[in-house]
Regions:
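Flavin (primarily FAD) cofactor-binding/catalytic cores of flavoenzymes
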Residues: 1-30, 34-36, 65-370
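Aromatic-lined carbohydrate-binding/catalytic grooves of carbohydrate-active enzymes
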Residues: 32, 41-44
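Short, flexible helix/strand-to-coil boundary loops that buttress conserved ligand/catalytic motifs
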Residues: 37-41, 48, 198
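Glycine-rich flavin
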Residues: 47-65, 215-217
Length: 370
């Protein structure tokens, strides 16, 4: 079987597949582990402590109550893959997935190679295609622009007024960092509930775990309600204005040259814009009938309607923790068990039905593959 992606979703499913004794290969488009983490800004610090940032099988090293940096996360993921000897093939971008006539999945890889697999896990995670609104095209070419994925450090941003568009955790964190060296305007489209990173001396996720809030899933009324709300962790609008002197603005509605206008009619002139406006899923490479009329994936806890095809690491795939590095293990173990059961079922079917040698295999290189 094949796993697409060697990041915070691909590694835990790999761990559990090894526990199940499954034969599999992890296909990674980049040349290194966890490319999505390498694309984040240098000073990024997780809002989950090390205690709640570990993958299955290995605790996150260091002070369990401290908060790991981007560099620490990357090093940890690399060690995890090495420790459990996960079979990863780098420089192997999956460009198409379709169904073969024999019922197996056919994966077209970069370089013209193909792989056939009885089962496939898409573990590309929630950070796929950076999104910026059409307004970006109306700004002058003299205005520095980048999506948050392209931001690394304050020195890369021209001096002057910087507009951060996006009121999520990313927008707030980057605004804080830039406020020490730039004039920062933060445009917030919709207000989010602010939660402290620590409460009564305990990490927020200690409380959420104790209250079993992170166990609430999309099948429950409370879980469905939570899934429609985003939360700010460790930041608040009041803190931004008072401590960091960031100017808060409502939704951005218009742009022309260097001028931008907000929903309340106020305007600003900007020298740089950072779009912290999130990501969009891109599954155009999956040529299978698993999407609804609006293009949304149809699944139940990552299990699609097509036998043998699974997804892992989606936002609210099942719970609030489904896309968080330290809480993805529940979904990963669930899917690994489904995969093992499916594999055993196929093996029993093959025993009952005479087939040509090699017709059933967990993973098979077709013509053009190594």
């Amino acid at each position: 079987m094949a796993v697409v992606g060697a990041g915070q979703a691909g590694l835990p499913i790999g761990y559990f597949l090894k526990q199940q004794g499954c034969h599999f290969l992890i296909l990674e488009r980049a040349r290194q582990i966890a490319p999505a983490w390498r694309e984040r800004w240098d000073s990024l610090t997780l809002f989950t402590s090390r205690r709640y940032s570990a993958l299955p099988g290995a605790p996150f090293p260091g002070d369990p109550d401290g908060y790991p940096t981007r560099a620490e996360v990357i090093a940890y993921l690399e060690r995890h893959a090495e420790t459990f000897e996960l079979p990863i093939e780098f420089d192997s971008e999956v460009r198409k997935v379709e169904l073969n006539e024999d019922g197996r999945f056919r994966l077209e890889l970069s370089g013209g190679r193909t792989v056939a697999a009885v089962q496939v896990v898409v573990a590309t995670g929630p950070f796929q295609t950076p999104y910026a609104p059409k307004l970006a095209e109306k700004l002058s070419t003299g205005v520095f622009q980048t999506h948050a994925v392209g931001y690394r450090r304050p020195d890369d941003v021209p001096q002057g007024t910087v507009l951060l568009v996006g009121g999520g955790n990313t927008g707030f964190q980057i605004a804080k960092e830039l406020s020490a060296s730039h004039k920062v305007v933060l445009s917030i489209g919709s207000r989010q509930k602010s939660l402290p990173q620590r409460l009564l001396g305990r990490d927020l996720f200690w409380w959420l775990t104790k209250a079993r809030i992170l166990d609430k899933n999309v099948d429950s009324r409370f879980g469905r309600k939570l899934s429609t709300r985003d939360t700010l962790i460790g930041s608040s609008p009041g803190e931004m204005t008072k401590r960091f002197r960031v100017e808060l603005k409502p939704r951005l509605v218009e742009a022309a040259e260097r001028r931008v206008r907000f929903e309340n009619g106020s305007e600003s002139e900007v020298d740089a814009v950072i779009w912290a406006t999130g990501y969009r899923s891109d599954y155009s490479w999956i040529k299978l009938p698993i999407f609804d009329e609006a293009g949304r994936l149809r699944h139940r806890r990552g299990v699609t309607e097509m036998p043998g095809l699974y997804f892992l690491g989606l936002t609210w795939q099942y719970t609030r923790g489904s896309a968080l590095i330290g809480f993805i293990k529940g979904d990963a173990e669930f899917i690994a068990e489904k995969i093992a059961a499916h594999e055993k079922s196929k093996a029993r079917e093959a025993e009952r039905t005479p087939v040509d040698a090699g017709a059933y295999a967990g993973l098979h290189s077709e013509e053009g593959a190594n």
